[in-house]
């Protein structure tokens, strides 16, 4: 049964009440103060002070100062008036209980409102941070597009200049060919003139030497061969057969069926898209791409904005729930936020999608085992965590970090801490 304190003193003005309460040697750490607009309680075991105030006060602006084994309260009145007494008189036990319960309810409602206001402010901060990040991403994307456009314009100009140079060079070659052809024609004409002149002189000489009455014949006949242009080449075609993509695995260790199944699952995952989402109408075209959302989540994770990264991965998973890297990256975010059960669920889902086990997905499977094992260990489920770490070591036996962590878990299970 606490001892009621009655040796207090108080003074007042029209706007405030000043109450001095001795602590009677009780440590300040053991003192509990509860104040509402109509009720004041100070509990410092084994003593208790209660005051059912004469009129309402402004408990938010009121203050309490502790020092020299005394608590001094400054209580500001809601209405400027002089009080007859500090506590209201003529109050029975039932009335006191109702005032206590009402004060507790008021304090609970105020605490609830403060919690909701804090949560709303946190959501607004997250929304603002996400909008700022998206704005930065948009500016970077626009900058990259402008750079691409400038490079495209430069390349187009260079290509046009090269085409113009080729056209002029072709025209120059054509002119040179025509000039050579004209020179050849002139040479042929000159050769013909020379041949005609020689044949004429020979005919005249033969006529002069031949007997009378005998017909003379021109025994000189000349055939000129003109240069002929070769015919154009015939059209042909070359058939190219591309080799199929194969994994760099020795034939004796090959898992052809599993590797083909993994490639098939990857292709199916890239084609699987869920567009029946109401929020899609408010998104831009690139924001509807799971790969773009995954990259955005990775950048947000790098800036330690884990909640925004989870939001990006959530939307990407709603668009395409067959991509294991989305679950794997979201598990890393949940680990950072200590959402351990969710981290275990996402790691397990990633391992389910990373089947069948092949060399191409070995690194992702190793990370999934490590993240799930880390979550188990933080939940103090060390045996399950060690099983995941051993599975990771089977995939990558040369990973020194995983080896050290697995050894630490074994020591915890055996009851001995590994000396660092």
From Swiss-Prot:
TPR repeats: 290-323, 324-357, 366-399
Stretches assigned to the CS domain: 3-87
GO MF entries: nuclear estrogen receptor binding
InterPro entries associated with the record: CS_dom, CS_DYX1C1, Dynein_assembly_factor_4, HSP20-like_chaperone, TPR-like_helical_dom_sf, TPR_rpt
GO biological process assignments: cilium movement; determination of left/right symmetry; epithelial cilium movement involved in extracellular fluid movement; establishment of localization in cell; heart development; inner dynein arm assembly; learning or memory; neuron migration
Summary of the tissues where the protein is detected: Expressed in several tissues, including brain, lung, kidney and testis. In brain localizes to a fraction of cortical neurons and white matter glial cells.
Any one cellular-component term (Gene Ontology): cytoplasm
Cited Pfam families: CS (PF04969)
Entry's localization field: Nucleus; Cytoplasm; Dynein axonemal particle; Cell projection, Neuron projection
Signal peptide segment: none
Superkingdom of this protein's organism: Eukaryota
SMART domains for this protein: TPR
Keyword Heme: no
Chain spans, region Mediates interaction with ESR1 and STUB1: 7-103
The protein's role, per its UniProt record: Axonemal dynein assembly factor required for ciliary motility. Involved in neuronal migration during development of the cerebral neocortex. May regulate the stability and proteasomal degradation of the estrogen receptors that play an important role in neuronal differentiation, survival and plasticity.
Stored PANTHER family: DYNEIN ASSEMBLY FACTOR 4, AXONEMAL (PTHR46492), DYNEIN AXONEMAL ASSEMBLY FACTOR 4 (PTHR46492:SF1)
Subunit field text: Interacts with ZMYND10. Interacts with ESR1 and ESR2. Interacts with STUB1. Interacts with DNAAF2. Interacts with CCT3, CCT4, CCT5 and CCT8. Interacts with DNAAF6/PIH1D3.
Noted disease: Dyslexia 1: A relatively common, complex cognitive disorder characterized by an impairment of reading performance despite adequate motivational, educational and intellectual opportunities. It is a multifactorial trait, with evidence for familial clustering and heritability. Ciliary dyskinesia, primary, 25: A disorder characterized by abnormalities of motile cilia. Respiratory infections leading to chronic inflammation and bronchiectasis are recurrent, due to defects in the respiratory cilia. Patients may exhibit randomization of left-right body asymmetry and situs inversus, due to dysfunction of monocilia at the embryonic node. Primary ciliary dyskinesia associated with situs inversus is referred to as Kartagener syndrome.
Protein name as annotated: Dynein axonemal assembly factor 4
Organism: Homo sapiens (Human)
Recorded name of the encoding gene: DNAAF4
